[in-house]
């Protein structure tokens, strides 16, 4: 009996390891919309929806900009044989979901998406195909899945069906579907993948129209299970429960590549630190709440402005901007003659301004510099990498990609703490 126990222990040790998933940097949809002149229309629609969500008590942190400013994507696979998906690795949410094969069918023609195909007699008379008059709500919403990788459960011999459904409200629409269980692999096929068997994931039957304008297929949530829709275990929690990692941690490194698109953008390291990109000294801060990666931010300063009011903050890999209270941002903007553009919800600043912001977490100050805080939209037109958080429920600050490009984030799931280490230059 003892020999069997020793063998099991040895197998567990062999199975545990450290894995890496490289990231691809894309231009955030927000930046593309600003350049195309469509951002203000997007913001108007988003604000109307968010007010409705607030009334219905459905607002989550991931709703703030509806993934309009996500910047880094990684590759995962689901099923056996493997089916590929590009996902946002998002510490601001907890569910893994990808489009299901049922989300789009070729038999639902694009001609059904014209305005004359609304329900009723008008549809029957004027629509180019009478079949479009049936289930018109579906016809109008399927297009977002058309060009996505979609999961086909019939093609996976490790798939397990469940009877649970899910729905997540975003700032610009929603995603909904049902849960399945299958083998999830973090990393591209043929690479050194973290293989997580029998993992819950969402199969989206519908995704908001906004997602049709993005490269992503789905979302890989990396926050805690308490935040998960349906209460299902996030894949990384499942991996830790199965003893697949050397340590119950993961490390995030984002590389500053300017405005380049489709290039290497950093790496997630599962089960260990990242000595190749992060300095050895790590300062940890205990989480105040283990739902998001939430902690106390003691103070902020920039040039002649400072405040030690103290706020709740989260680290969020799914946003290319930082979020902060309105009063704080307006005080910071004044230091650099920045102007708030209400219709855009953003702060315009001279591209030559050396915007720096220090935040205090625990006993340490962390500096964000102009290379990460001043974003060029067009020639001689720049914005500060911040948005206002005042209308949202929850933490007052989001430290997003501008902060993570300065400091590697080490997420300690077991000890419920987050660590920060300076990026190597």
From Swiss-Prot:
Effect of pH on activity: Optimum pH is 5.
Top EC class for this record: hydrolase
Modulation of this protein's activity: Inhibited by pepstatin A.
Keywords: Aspartyl protease, Disulfide bond, Glycoprotein, Hydrolase, Protease, Secreted, Signal, Zymogen
Family matches, as Pfam families: Asp
Tissues with expression: Expressed in intestine, amphidal glands and excretory gland (at protein level).
Superkingdom of the organism of origin: Eukaryota
UniProt-listed InterPro entries: Aspartic_peptidase_A1 (IPR001461), Aspartic_peptidase_AS (IPR001969), Pepsin-like_dom (IPR034164), PEPTIDASE_A1 (IPR033121), Peptidase_aspartic_dom_sf (IPR021109)
GO MF annotation terms: aspartic-type endopeptidase activity
SUPFAM superfamilies: Acid proteases
Gene Ontology biological-process annotations: proteolysis
Cystine pairings recorded for this chain: 103-145, 351-382
Role: Aspartic protease which cleaves several human serum proteins including hemoglobin, fibrinogen and albumin. Appears to cleave preferentially between P1 (Ala, Leu, Val, Phe and Gly) and P1' (Ala and Leu) residues.
Family the entry assigns: Belongs to the peptidase A1 family.
PANTHER family from the UniProt entry: BETA-SITE APP-CLEAVING ENZYME, ISOFORM A-RELATED (PTHR47966), PEPTIDASE A1 DOMAIN-CONTAINING PROTEIN (PTHR47966:SF45)
The name this protein goes by in its record: Aspartic protease 2
Species annotation: Necator americanus
Gene (UniProt): apr-2
């Amino acid at each position: 009996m003892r020999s069997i126990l020793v063998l099991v222990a040895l197998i567990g040790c062999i199975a545990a390891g450290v894995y890496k998933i490289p990231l691809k940097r894309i231009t955030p949809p927000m930046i593309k919309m600003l350049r195309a002149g469509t951002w203000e229309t997007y913001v108007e629609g988003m604000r109307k929806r968010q007010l409705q969500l607030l009334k219905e008590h459905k607002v989550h942190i991931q709703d703030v900009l509806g993934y309009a400013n996500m910047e880094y994507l990684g590759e995962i696979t689901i099923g056996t044989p493997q089916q590929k998906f590009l996902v946002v690795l998002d510490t601001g949410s907890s569910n893994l979901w990808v489009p299901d094969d049922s989300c789009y069918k070729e038999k639902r023609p694009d001609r059904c998406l014209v305005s004359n195909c609304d329900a009723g007699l008008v549809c029957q008379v004027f629509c180019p195909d009478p079949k479009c008059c049936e289930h018109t709500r579906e016809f109008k919403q399927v297009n977002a899945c058309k060009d996505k990788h979609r999961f086909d459960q019939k093609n996976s011999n490790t798939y397990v069906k469940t009877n649970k459904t899910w729905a997540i409200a975003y700032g610009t629409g929603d995603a909904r579907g049902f849960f399945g269980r299958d083998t999830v692999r973090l990393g591209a096929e043929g690479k050194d993948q973290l293989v997580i068997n029998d993992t819950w994931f969402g199969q989206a039957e519908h995704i908001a129209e906004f997602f049709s304008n993005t490269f992503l297929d789905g979302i890989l949530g990396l926050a805690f299970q308490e935040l998960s829709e349906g209460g299902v275990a996030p894949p990384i929690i499942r991996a830790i429960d199965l003893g697949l990692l050397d340590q119950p941690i993961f490390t995030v490194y984002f590389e500053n590549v300017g405005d380049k698109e489709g290039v290497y953008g950093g790496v997630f390291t599962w089960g260990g630190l990242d000595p190749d990109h992060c300095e050895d000294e790590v300062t940890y801060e205990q989480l105040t709440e283990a739902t998001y990666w939430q902690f106390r931010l003691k103070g902020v300063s920039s040039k002649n402005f400072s405040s030690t009011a103290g706020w709740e903050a989260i680290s969020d890999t799914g946003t290319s901007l930082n979020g902060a209270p309105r009063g704080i941002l307006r005080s910071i903007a004044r230091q650099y003659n920045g102007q708030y553009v209400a219709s855009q919800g953003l702060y315009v600043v001279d591209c030559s301004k050396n915007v720096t912001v220090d935040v205090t977490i625990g006993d340490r100050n962390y500096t964000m510099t102009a290379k990460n805080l001043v974003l060029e939209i067009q020639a001689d037109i720049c914005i500060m990498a911040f948005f206002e958080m005042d209308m949202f429920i929850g933490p007052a600050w989001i430290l997003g990609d501008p902060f993570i490009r300065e400091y590697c984030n080490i997420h300690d799931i077991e000890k419920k703490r987050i660590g920060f280490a300076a990026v190597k230059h």
